[in-house]
Amino acid sequence: MRPDAFPESDLPHVPHEPTGGRATLLLTGAYLGLCVLLGGGTRQGLPAEAVLQLLALPLIVHGLVRWSARPRSTAARLALAWAVLVPVGFLLQCLPLPPSLWTTLGGRAELVEELQAAGVAVGWHALSLDPDASLRAALAWLPPLALGLLTLGLHRTQQVRLLQGVLVIALASAVLGLAQLAGGPESPLRWHAVTNVQAAVGPFANRNHLAALLVLALPLEAAQMINAGARIVAGEQRPRRTAAVSVGIVAGVLLLLS
């Protein structure tokens, strides 16, 4: 990993930075924090998820406008194409098919027998055995699609700052998890009705969700520490951020407790 893989926030200004970049960075960070705060439930179709999905729609439009104004690499084009094809695939599964077609698909014979036994006409049915679940899966793809598009529209320096924001979110979640452990199963800091009451869950309902966030933060923290070490070796004597180290310590403790 190169020493400059995770530079400090005082990177030099890069010319030709798209206008509105700072506002987009703040918007992306705020939406990311909102996703962590409101997401992570154990059930699908929660009102909080609907709020995040509705907010994602104008953000996707804004992200497309920002992304179209920047040079687009082949990798970015392929990533965007894949990100769009995934929810489209879910939506296609919800389209109704004629009986002559869907009854020939795998796993449909038993369903046809049950419909006939119940006296229900074998009419048009979707490709998906659970169209509602397929629709929820497509809608669940909106927030990550919005975040991805917004991030592609950011300058590299701003993308690094956004990653540093992920470290801050992970640190806050880890500290919240420790406070939940200290407060016990009835801690008011557990705001999900269905949750792991004997474990640290942070802003989520499931301890595995918190563990996934902390695991995601570990390589970011490692890059931050490697960059800081390289700058110290280079003779730069400026104070170092301690957030990355704190994330590593707290994350290690919580991973052991999980």
Question: Over which residues does each language-model region extend?
Answer:
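Extended N-terminal export/anchoring regions of large proteins
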Residues: 73-74, 124-134
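Alpha-helical transmembrane segments of multi-pass inner-membrane proteins
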Residues: 2-39, 49, 53-62, 87, ...
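Canonical alpha-helical transmembrane segments
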Residues: 59-72
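Cytoplasmic-side transmembrane-helix entry/capping segments in multi-pass membrane proteins
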Residues: 74-84, 163-168
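Extracytosolic (periplasmic/ER-lumenal) interhelical loops and adjacent juxtamembrane/interface segments
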Residues: 100-129
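N-terminal membrane-targeting/anchoring modules of bacterial envelope and secretion proteins
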Residues: 42-43, 47-48, 74-77
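A cytosolic-side transmembrane-helix exit/cap motif
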Residues: 75, 101-105, 184-190
